[in-house]
């Protein structure tokens, strides 16, 4: 962050992590297990503003300034724009790298080119995908479906089969809730998935 604290969960878009680790690992998976596609989570929706020295160098090249702009400053929107452009560069880089060796591999980045990233598709992805919030899922699906059905790409949405409420564990949704969520997606022509958490042994409760 701006104070120099690092994030233990988020990789910098300006680092060599994709080239050094992620892309080789994805190629290994494709080569070793003959998978037909990859779906990467926590991509555009997990991206953070970067205040590292590599980001500073990129910002200087982008804007000519040595200093990061303050939130609310006139240049702050340009600072965010730089990160958006960098994310798309990163997305195209890993997709193109995989296709260079596995041209038939279907690549998908969760929530890319949806309302979370409302841009024309500029990466060689196979489809558009997202998993919407466990709360108010029907309303979220209604908004997202109207956008996705106009992209010209195959798309799918996944709803959670349970709610998570502060102070209590996961609460399984009713059949009626899940049917409503699925109906909204399917009536707009999208693919539908439902997300449950099986046990480590793969057991799925009978009620599911």
Give the residues covered by each predicted segment.
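Polar helix-capping/helix-linker motif
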Residues: 1, 14-15, 52, 203-206
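Active-site-adjacent "subsite" loops/lids of carbohydrate-active enzymes
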Residues: 1-33, 59-80, 92
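Generic detector of bulky aromatic hydrophobic side chains
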Residues: 3, 8-10, 33, 42-44, ...
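Short acidic catalytic loops
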Residues: 22, 29-47, 193
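Hydrophobic targeting/anchoring helices
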Residues: 36-41, 69-81, 86-208
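Short, solvent-exposed beta-strand-terminating loops
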Residues: 41-65
């Amino acid at each position: 962050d701006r104070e120099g604290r690092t994030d233990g969960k988020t990789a910098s878009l300006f680092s060599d992590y994709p080239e050094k680790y992620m892309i080789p690992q994805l190629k290994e998976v494709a080569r070793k297990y003959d998978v037909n596609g990859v779906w990467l989570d926590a991509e555009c929706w997990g991206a953070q503003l970067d205040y590292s020295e590599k980001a500073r160098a990129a910002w200087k090249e982008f804007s000519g300034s040595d200093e990061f702009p303050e939130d609310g400053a006139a240049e702050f929107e340009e600072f965010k724009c730089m990160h958006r452009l960098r994310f798309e560069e990163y997305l195209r880089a890993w997709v193109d790298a995989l296709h260079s060796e596995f041209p038939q591999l279907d690549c998908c980045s969760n929530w890319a080119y949806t309302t979370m990233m409302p841009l024309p598709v500029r990466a060689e992805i196979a489809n558009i995908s997202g998993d919407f919030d466990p709360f108010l899922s029907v309303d979220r699906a209604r908004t997202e479906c109207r956008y996705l059905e106009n992209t010209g790409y195959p798309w799918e949405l996944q709803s959670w089969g349970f709610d998570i409420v502060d102070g209590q564990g996961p609460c399984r949704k009713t059949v009626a809730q899940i049917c409503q969520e699925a109906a909204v997606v399917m009536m707009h022509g999208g693919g539908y998935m439902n997300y449950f958490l099986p046990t480590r042994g793969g057991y799925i409760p009978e009620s599911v």
